[in-house]
Amino acid sequence: MNRVSVLSKYQCLKINSPNRFFSKYFTTSTINSTKITNDQSQTNSAGKEISQPILKSQDKLKKSILKTSTDTNFLKDINKKHRQHYIKPQKDDENIILKTLNDLKTNNLNTKELISDRLSELFLNKEMIKLISENEIESINEIFKIVLGAKKSQQPPTVAFFTKSFLNKSSKEFKMKLDSLPIIVYFLSVFESKDIMKSSDSDSDSTATNNYLTVGKGISKKFIQNFQDSISSELDITDLQEHLSDMIKLSKFSRLLGYLTNVEISRDKIKKLKDKNEIFNQLINEFGENINEIEFQNLFKNEIHFISFLLTLSRNQIITILSISNNSCYEEEEEVEEVEEVNVKGEGGELFKRVDKYEDNNKGIFNQNKIKSLIENIPVSKVRERLYWFLLMAKLRYPISENYFNDIEISLHYEKDPSFILFFFNHFKIFGYIPSDSSEAKIFQRYVRVATLDEALHYFDSIKKKPQSLNIIMITHLLLAMNKFNNQLDRKIIIDSTTNTTTNTTINTTINNNKIKKYQRSIENEMLTLYSSKIKDIIGSNSSLYNFTLSQLLHGEKWRKVLFNTLVTQLIEKHINSVTDETLLIINEYFSIHKDDVILKKLYELSKKIHLSKELLSNLTIQFLIHKRDYSNAINSLIELYKQETPILKSTLKLLIKSDPTHPILFEFYKTLPQQFELIEPTNQEQEQDQQDQPPPPQQQQEQQQEQQQQQEQQQQQDQQQQDQQQDQQEKQQIKEIKPKLKEKLESEKLINSELFLECINDPMKLYRILDGKIEILASTFQSIVMKSLESGKYQFVESIISKRFGDSSKSIDKHLLSKLITIPNLPISKDDPYNIEKLLLTNNRSENLALYNKLFNLSLNNGLLNCAKNYILKIIQQSNQRLVTSLCYQGEEALIYSYILSLNNLNIINNNQENNNNNNNDLKETIENQIIKWIESVFGCNSLNEINNDDFVFSILLGFHHSTSAYYKKQIGNLNEQQQLPSSLYLKIRSNLMQVINKYFDLIVLDRMILSSYGLESKYYGEAIDFQKDFISMITINELYQYTILKLNLLEKKNNNNNNNNNNNSYYRISIDKKFIENNDQSFNEIDLLLKNISTKQISVIVPFLMGFIENPSLMKYLSVILSNDLNKYDTATTTTTTTTIGNNFIQRLMESSSNSKEIDFLNISNTFFFKYFISVGDLKSAFKVHFKQIHILIRFRLIQDILKNQPLVMDHIFKIISSELELEQQQQQQQQQQQQQQQQQQQQQQQQQQKSSSPSLDYGLIESLLSVTSILNDSKSIHFSLKLYNLASEHAKLNNSRIPLSITNSKDLVLSGFKNRNDHFQLSENLKISDIEKQMKQTRGAGADGADEIIIKNHLTSSQLLNDIKYILIHSNYKQLKGIGFGVLRGDIPFTINDKIKVFLLVEAFAAEEGREKVNSFLNTPSLLNNSLDFELLRTPKITKLISFIFRTNSSIKHDSNYFPEFSPDFLPNKFKFYSAHLEDINNNDNDNSIQDISNIVNCNSGPESFYYRKVLKYFFKKRILKNL
């Protein structure tokens, strides 16, 4: 019985597999180490549901199976009868089956009463299977139970037959569950058992057995397929097969050990196993009781297969097995609770380490010390044993320290089988241990070290196929492996010489030095191609990866330098945006190592192209100049630095000191520094004495000493180093000439480089003492001292020097210092004296105090000092009178209300965190809320809002509030807990107040003006301003707009009449309009008509915002378009007065006149926006873009154009046509300029000016960039094509003007394409075709046609679907003109494609070029159906395309006709080629009568040659015509 209990534990052996799908489902049940008795197994069987893979109730069945499978007698009865023992069902059979099934469902089936053979046979009967399936048994486990119940069915043939028929017939009808897998595996294991083979007595028996074995294997395959279908499509069939066979082998102990270890690894060791089988049988049969102590120890210490067997079990099972041995020399293991399985996937792809700790109470066989001693006792030569123990440790989740990793490294160092290293490495990861980057790299390096070159390259190839797996660690492995390859042959020789002298001599004789060099060269080339092709693509814009790779290439062989150069070039050309300061520092370091001028130049180029930190830029520039010995420029640029920001100079000088501390330029520069202290320059004799009093940095003294030493050395070695000395003298001479200029500049600027001094004299107090009293400390120096002191916490010192500097004297505190102090993140605010800094800073009652209070308020809040915060906010509210806040707004401070609102939200959050002070905080919050509302009301309630400044103020408050609430709500809603509710009450209160204010005072002109100017395009509030404008215009009715407009007109007149009269009574300007009058649409329309008709030119600017209100409100837009429309028919709904027809025309003309004459940018922007929106809404696209074309990018920034482009795709084509027509116009003008004489130039200029006003002829790169940015947001195929067209247009324009396209445009285009690529995976190019290759080839062979593209296509494509995919990609991402030959190349017949595929390719490429086909192809390109055979050719069938294809069929004999696709191309379609030629030419001539037939016939008839030559010429001509027309 003991044997059975042990065996039962292995029925659900956990599959140890990297396949995550498996780990999800194959969870092991917890196993008790207690023995299971008969009673338990019987009593437990009835009531329990079948939920786990192996049930205790089935132990009997398992026992019987195992006994029969190992019992040799049962095979003697095997003969053909077994396969024919099935009988026809009788009438009662159905009832029996149904009853049995019912019992199964209700769990009444008692396994004690073993089911009769008859019942078992019934279940095996083919005709009964259907009946069984109709009864919906949830799992096939129950059926198997019944089948196993009968003795006869336990014999392999019966089981085989049943399994086969059952799986074949019913797997789709039954729901197969994973828990049935172990039972099925049992069946399958019977056929593969060695015992069957051993026990066959006669030949006939063995053949029968073999038949069953083959049946079994067939079943297993069939089963795998069904299993895969029914369980999950995720499963990889090969994986499943592999794991299934593992399970089969696991479940038979007789073959357990041979398969538990990785078969590939240990083939040689399997033979040795037979001798040791006895130990294992003993271990298994008498497990835990009679095992010999020594044998048990030996098992652990020396038997590698036993450990590998343990590795295949679940953690609990391992512990159970190892803890059973009571009599062994090890302590007894207490029962261990199952720890949850650790998620080995890792979230977000990050490297991770074990989180859970395995509690080790120094009990049981497996405490860490014992494992450690075990490992230490294993001889170093037994590498595998040690490594397996490490794996076992990992499996049991012991913490593996760095020391262990070292041990692993050492062990791996001696392991010579690369496949085992891979096995080890992968399993180590599976068990959830990811070593640090360096450890992993080292471990993996061992693999590369023992692998042959081929194996390693094969590994690299596998990486190449999965670019995403090429992470930083893998690159490390590759780079580390490089060195090894270069010396691999030598290593082979060395190793072989140590092992075998004969092989050494043979190798030496066969491989001579030349071959070794050649071999190394090939390796270098291989690595270079691998890196330059793959890694560049993979790295892309990943700057950290780039930097890592570059840093790895700093030292080493020649190919590394080559690669470094190519990567840097690639960086400059393609990924300039991913260049960081770090990148430049690496390149700089490379230069300092190799002194490579080429790199330095590239670095210099690079630094010019990108917006780097000024620091680096200056460092590079100066280094470059010094390297070129251009000292005058170097010093000049140092002076430039000196004028700008101090930190730059500091780092530049530091860098120079680092690279060459004795460089003369440094001394000269340092010597000039003391001059700016306004000290009398000491004479040479005094200089040494006064040195200590002056504050030059300590480095300077060292530098000077070094210089003196250097001069002495030079004198000593004068004879040897004459040239060097001369060079030095020249340099010094140059510097002497520059020195006076340098002094002049520095003295005139009166600068001080305080940062440099602070850097050299670290202690700010010391520096202050050095400077104090001797010279007037400049503000910047003082500021630095204060800031440094505050950082280091010397508050008293700061207090004393500030009070000394500002306290007694009448001087007010320095503004810059104040602004700096306010920005200190942790300005000290103590609970005892919250005003300690305040006392120092608040000298008089100037406006900066408000900002300071604001800062102090926020600080108090962040430090949790709520009472301080309350005091400060009350002070702010008391102090902030309207003028003060207005002036602050003008100073660029954020609207204060913004910070208050955010602060309240913070208070609220603090409120929730500090539950103790809940009531106080609520009170505080309420008082502050009330104060703010009172404050807002008081500010808004004052009667002097007529001044424009105050409109600004109101707007800034509104905008600030809108910004703070919307931004805060957007940001915080996701991040806050439910408890932390936002102060919505305040929001609603203020919002209602705002609406009152808006209704009372709102001014659309102010709004528009503020949006367009003060909060201009660059403002961070810009987006919020637009949203806000939309918000509040949407609340306004047409009546209010009209009323408001009248109000503004009166206001305007009033202002004109009384310029000096400040009338504060707003109601005076309000005109009360009768509601009935407003509600009567006809009448109000008439009023508006009259208003528009009679408005004076001066007043037009007032009207525009009114009209804008219409446009912003879609429901009102229709009224406006009716009023302004010139078309009477559109005006049927309203009253048709005589004035209406002319109003629209007059008004728009007058508005255009006034806007063209106006110098006010604000008005221009508003009116142009209006025109654009108005024309778009009316549908007059041409006018929309002609009105004021240059303004489109403003509209784009307004976010207006996005909606228009989305809803009206035609707009894109219009924009493009306008841009391109203007470009043509510009070209014409250029030609005219060349032809005309100087006398006509003035006229020409006048014309140009006029045209610029109307249509802006020069190409506006900013506009193109803006449009590209819009299309990147839209991200659909139309916008992609549009952006590519724009980009091509810009590049053509750049070529014409011999200029370069701005980098920003290229980046915008790349952004568009990358967004598109991410969205449509099926547009990716297949791996073996790179678009850059094709484009490169096209450039080379552009003159000779498109043969290059054909060759590439032919070389790289074996399947048509892949080619179609690539062509799709090319059409979308490239300029068609470069690739138009692909279609012909495919049709030529050189590619082994079917005719249908050829036609598909041809149609795609050429229809894209033909005008009729292009739109269809565009829509077609967006559907994935391109890859299916169900290509709808009707989409592309146009008259010209049809003729073209028939022409190809007629002229190219290598294309066989397929009438299914194109029935009209049957041989009878055209009698002969000549007719077709003439018809075709006639057709071309009729459509394009600007060319004569003669030209075409010349093309066709030129040269003799193969027929394909002619058709290509004709087609080329045809498509050339098409392309020119379109582009």
From Swiss-Prot:
Keywords: Coiled coil. Residues 262-293, 699-751, 905-932, 1217-1255 form a coiled coil. Residues 683-734 are annotated as: Disordered. SUPFAM superfamilies: beta-sandwich domain of Sec23/24. The keyword Hydrolase does not apply. The keyword Transferase does not apply. Residues 700-728 have a biased composition (Low complexity). This is Putative uncharacterized protein DDB_G0292556. It comes from Dictyostelium discoideum.
